[in-house]
Design a protein with these regions (language model features):
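Solvent-exposed, non-transmembrane regions of membrane-associated and secreted proteins
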Residues: 13-180
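N-terminal Sec-pathway targeting helices
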Residues: 1-13
Length: 180
């Protein structure tokens, strides 16, 4: 009986270790923030014209923003900033602008607490600010790229990973309120 119990605990420990190591691997793999099946637009924002800061005061988010370009279906990520997808429109222009970051506490970890009506402020290098209001939030599978589709309004789609082993995306969509 002791031998069976010992083997049970050894197998359980190895299983937990495997899941833990796999979780660390997923957290450190840049491709985890990508949306499977997303095809970027042909137009790309000129370097330096994109936003350089995003603030969601109600969630304690105040981050620098770097420009990101998908290359060979790899979505660049940073451990210290959010990423603006340069193949999407500039935030505030007509269309669906995309900003994403890891779900770490220091990045978009609190985005999962976003509520309809909260303000998102995007700042540009010339100190121009665009204010958006969160219209809805949702959790979608990693392959539901339709959430990133072009739109006819002036929206910004913010997203981060969520779910078991980052298998889903938490999405907050905000609509342009004003130009300040």
């Amino acid at each position: 009986m002791k031998k069976i119990l010992s083997w049970f605990f050894i197998i359980q420990a190895l299983s937990l270790l495997t899941v833990g190591l796999y979780s660390v691997y997923l957290a450190q793999t840049p491709a985890q923030l990508e949306f499977s099946g997303y095809t970027p637009a042909k137009t790309v924002t000129a370097q330096g014209l994109g936003p350089n800061r995003i603030t969601i005061s109600d969630l304690g988010i105040d981050l620098p923003v770097q420009q990101a370009k998908i290359v060979n279906n790899v979505w660049p990520t940073s451990s210290s900033s959010a990423e603006y997808l340069t193949s999407s429109p500039l935030p505030g222009n007509t269309g669906n602008s995309i900003i994403y970051a890891h779900d770490w506490a220091s990045l978009f970890g609190s985005l999962r607490n976003a509520k309809v009506g909260q303000k998102v402020v995007v700042t540009y290098p010339d100190k121009t600010k665009k204010t958006f209001v969160i219209a809805y939030t949702s959790i979608v599978p990693y392959n539901q790229a339709s959430i990133l589709a072009p739109s006819k309004d002036n929206r910004i789609t913010l997203y981060t990973c969520t779910g078991f082993l980052d298998s889903q995306r938490f999405v907050a969509v905000a609509i342009l309120k004003d130009n300040s």
